[in-house]
Structure formats: structure tokens, C-alpha cells
Amino acid sequence: FSITRNPDTSCHQMLVDMSQRKIMIKLPWDDFTNYSALQSLPEAQSILNSLTVVPALVYVLGQLRAQSPDERNENNSDTLWYKVLSKTLSTKFDCEIESTQFDALNFMELAQKLVNDPLSDAFKFLVNSPTSSGGEDE
């Protein structure tokens, strides 16, 4: 993944570009500034991954599912991200990306597993942060 500032200042949403060597996550100007301020904090990585990488992966996986198994390889095999994703799915999840088995996967669950389930660590960080109210239910 490469997380960058979206040069289009009129765009106020995160965008994902799969056409490059790496998956590009383009953030609006202000969001990228905030992201940049947090990315150097190791304890914030789980939050940043939950906010950016997980939804980007869900999007990418959904875009791949919309293609036939043969089209997946034809359209994406020259990108590094596709090669890495294909190998990871095969070795860690015993699933070939160009198979119909891929289509049956729960992409929200898979996206979280692909980035080591950042959600739990993100919640722990937020609950234990100095500004937290202790995590009580409303």
C-alpha cells in the first residue's frame, strides 16, 4: 500500500487506485495531514490500518470478485500488489485468487486477517488513551 495525499482538493473522500504497482490510498488534504502526524506513532498503527487499509482491501477484494477468475489474472498480474495478495491467499488461507472459492470468502473478515486483525488493538489503544472515559457502555 502507498498512502498519499489526493491532489484533487475538491475530493473529500478516501479513494483507492488499483491500477498502480502498489494499491494507492488517496486521502483528502486534511486527512492526509492528520494521517502523517499519526503514522510515526507505533501505537496508532492499528487505528490507521483500521481506518484506511481494511476498507481499501475490502474494496479491492470486491473489485476482484466482480471479475471472472481469468480476468483477475489478465487485468492485474503485472502489479506487485496482485502477486503478493495471490501468494498470501494461497499460502496462508489455502485459496487461489483465480478460483471460484475466492468468490465465496467474507471479504470484511479476510481484509482484517490480511493485516493482522487491527481492530482489537485499535479499540484497546482508544480505551487506554489519556482522553478515554474508560470505555463504559452508553
What residue spans do the PLM features occupy?
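Bergerat-fold GHKL/Histidine-kinase-like ATPase
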Residues: F1-E138
